[in-house]
């Protein structure tokens, strides 16, 4: 019975229930052929002796290439003996790509749904496995080759095309620039078409290296190619396999992608296997990326950046004098920032007292600058000149955070102002006496103390009234 999609395509007829191939006499016994060269893990997995090695379980991840029920159904290879000497594209389990191969006559295997194929070129499965010319593959991993029909390919068609320089590997892709004309004579002039492959690369492929496939076959080819790559190139930070090659399957997910659903990444489709997490996507979403090829490891990037960071350590001693200068000016900056709350509290007090007498002396009397530096030393570094001229700023309300600190600052400020006022007054009298050549009058000790107390009481009384 031929398929409606064409003589070379299998029937698009699926069963929604997981089934298994019937193989009488296999339970608890070895299969009629040796699987050691086909599945290298068969000898290391003792659970295979008690189960059917070719059973299709839809609820397991295909680490041993366990197929999905969507690929089952009678196809053109279901008739024993009819597929002998047929050229096909057979999938290689080691890397997931398709290669040209020829089916060998093995009716006993074809009845069980498997085929013995001979590849056109010897394949090396890995450093520990020998080169293999013949191999047993599943029926669903074989796609029959058809004559070149390049003139019928249009943009958007799904194909398997040669993508690497050796012209041996067939990978899934989408036609970008096809031959939309239906005239074979005009199409024969064009010998190449542009194909956008699954890994983001675009290349021109000859018509003889393109095989048109259905959307279902294309999706399954991409999915299996993806899983084969993740097993060969795991990422150390994100790799968390859900099933093991050397032990029972434990972390599997029971739901697979439906046949009619678009091929999305696991971040976009929640029914995908956890092996596909953080490995790439075909949906084009930003967190998934556009390719599955491994990126540069972070350790290599850090190793290249380390030599660039070494010269900065040699420049550190040159910055020492600058740091000392900054440290000398630090008390001024800290005192100005810490006293900002105190300045707002004493705005009216500063306006009433007016500018300090030291500035008035500077404008009235031309004296030695040594005497002008004395009040600055007595007042301390925590009182910059500009703080006395600040005329605006809201007063903090009672109960706000920082009220206790502002009260302490106010008391310290009043005490410093009192000392500076006394020192400035004494300095002014000395300057006047020197200018008039008169001796300053001696003040009794009791009168000086009485004057200090009266001034402090007056300031405290004013602060209470201002509150």
Swiss-Prot record:
Transmembrane stretches, start-end: none
Ranges for region Disordered: 416-467
InterPro entries: DUF4537 (IPR032770)
Compositionally biased tracts (Polar residues): 455-467
The organism's place on the tree of life at top rank: Eukaryota
Pfam annotation, one family: DUF4537
Protein name: Uncharacterized protein C11orf16
